[in-house]
Structures are given as C-alpha cells and as structure tokens.
Amino acid sequence: MEKFKKAGKIASKVRKKAIKAVKGEMKILDLAEFIENEIEKMGAKPAFPCNISVNEITAHYSPPCNDDRKILPGDLVKIDIGVHVDGFIGDTATTVLVEGYEDLKNYNDELAEKNKKMIEAAESALENAINTIRDGVEIGKIGEVIENTINKFGFKPISNLTGHTIDRWVLHSGLSIPNVKGQNSHKL
C-alpha cells in the first residue's frame, strides 16, 4: 500500500506543476516531456505516455516525437498523468484553460466562460463522486451522482470514459466507474 500512496503523491505533485507549466505558444510535446521528466526527478516512472488532449480531443492523446503543434491561449487542455513506483500506479488528470486569451482580439468570451463552467462541472462531479464512495455503495449510484452533477451545469457527461480501479502493473483493472447512471449494481 505504501508504494501506491507514494505513486499517488508524486502524481499529485506533478499535476500541480503541470498546471503551472501550461503556457500559450508551448508545444504539446514539450509539456509532455516536462511532465515525464518531473515524474522521473521524483524517483518514479511514467505509468503510460503522458496524455495531453487539446480542445475537441476529449482524452488520451499522447504527442508523437515529431509533434510540433502548440498550445494556444484560450485552449482547453486536458492532462492525464500516470506514475508508477515498482509497478504500483497513481493516475490523475486535470483540465486547464490556457491563460492569455483575454488579450486576443478574435477570442470568444462566451466560449471562455463555457470552458470555465465545464472545468467547474468536472471538479464538482469528482468531489460529489468521492463523497458518495463508501463501503456497500452501488457503482451505478456513483455514475448517477456524476451525471446529475454535470447535467446541473448544463453539460452531458461522456459515457464511454470511466474511472477505474488499478492494480500493480495494471492501469485498468477490474471495476470501471461510469460517468453516467447505469445498471451496474455491483457494490464497493
């Protein structure tokens, strides 16, 4: 259990550093390399290639070594970080609205507000889901809480992305926690 905790703590620290590192005009690949280097500096290894998904790319994009695309002010950047310590995995993600869009002449303020609201919805859904988790709760109930929270913000959750259990050396093991109400009556 201690190595799971260590991996989780490193993932959390790296996530915080990644949030501060995201800048307009930065290459996606440079951000991925920064994140993976920070993981290694802290004595761990990446559990999977860092995922950096921009705007309409919802999740799981890892930039190839020749990717020269840049993150721009106003972009919505989703960062998914995996850390392992001897195969014990910590997995975390966050979403960042890249600063500097306020100075752009052609930037859509309405889109910026919608993106801020989307980040707030995701953070609230996560918090509500965590508060729902307890011994004996049905997995479908957790998904229902997530879906209801996101809907209250005027958004629809992505049904084919889930939370998941992790085991040593196995990133997606056993149970999946849906983002939507489901028929899963399996209990924690």
Swiss-Prot record:
<dbReference type="InterPro" id="IPR036005">
    <property type="entry name" value="Creatinase/aminopeptidase-like"/>
</dbReference>
<dbReference type="InterPro" id="IPR050247">
    <property type="entry name" value="Met_Aminopeptidase_Type2"/>
</dbReference>
<dbReference type="GO" id="GO:0046872">
    <property type="term" value="F:metal ion binding"/>
</dbReference>
<dbReference type="InterPro" id="IPR000994">
    <property type="entry name" value="Pept_M24"/>
</dbReference>
<protein>
    <recommendedName>
        <fullName>Methionine aminopeptidase</fullName>
        <ecNumber>3.4.11.18</ecNumber>
    </recommendedName>
</protein>
<dbReference type="InterPro" id="IPR018349">
    <property type="entry name" value="Pept_M24A_MAP2_BS"/>
</dbReference>
<feature type="binding site">
    <location>
        <position position="91"/>
    </location>
    <ligand>
        <name>a divalent metal cation 2</name>
    </ligand>
</feature>
<comment type="similarity">
    <text>Belongs to the peptidase M24A family. Methionine aminopeptidase archaeal type 2 subfamily.</text>
</comment>
<keyword id="KW-0378">Hydrolase</keyword>
<dbReference type="InterPro" id="IPR001714">
    <property type="entry name" value="Pept_M24_MAP"/>
</dbReference>
<feature type="binding site">
    <location>
        <position position="80"/>
    </location>
    <ligand>
        <name>a divalent metal cation 1</name>
    </ligand>
</feature>
<keyword id="KW-0645">Protease</keyword>
<dbReference type="Pfam" id="PF00557">
    <property type="entry name" value="Peptidase_M24"/>
</dbReference>
<dbReference type="GO" id="GO:0006508">
    <property type="term" value="P:proteolysis"/>
</dbReference>
<keyword id="KW-0031">Aminopeptidase</keyword>
<feature type="binding site">
    <location>
        <position position="164"/>
    </location>
    <ligand>
        <name>a divalent metal cation 2</name>
    </ligand>
</feature>
<dbReference type="GO" id="GO:0004239">
    <property type="term" value="F:initiator methionyl aminopeptidase activity"/>
</dbReference>
<keyword id="KW-0479">Metal-binding</keyword>
<comment type="subunit">
    <text>Monomer.</text>
</comment>
<feature type="binding site">
    <location>
        <position position="172"/>
    </location>
    <ligand>
        <name>substrate</name>
    </ligand>
</feature>
<comment type="function">
    <text>Removes the N-terminal methionine from nascent proteins. The N-terminal methionine is often cleaved when the second residue in the primary sequence is small and uncharged (Met-Ala-, Cys, Gly, Pro, Ser, Thr, or Val).</text>
</comment>
<feature type="binding site">
    <location>
        <position position="60"/>
    </location>
    <ligand>
        <name>substrate</name>
    </ligand>
</feature>
<feature type="binding site">
    <location>
        <position position="91"/>
    </location>
    <ligand>
        <name>a divalent metal cation 1</name>
    </ligand>
</feature>
<dbReference type="GO" id="GO:0008235">
    <property type="term" value="F:metalloexopeptidase activity"/>
</dbReference>
<dbReference type="GO" id="GO:0005737">
    <property type="term" value="C:cytoplasm"/>
</dbReference>
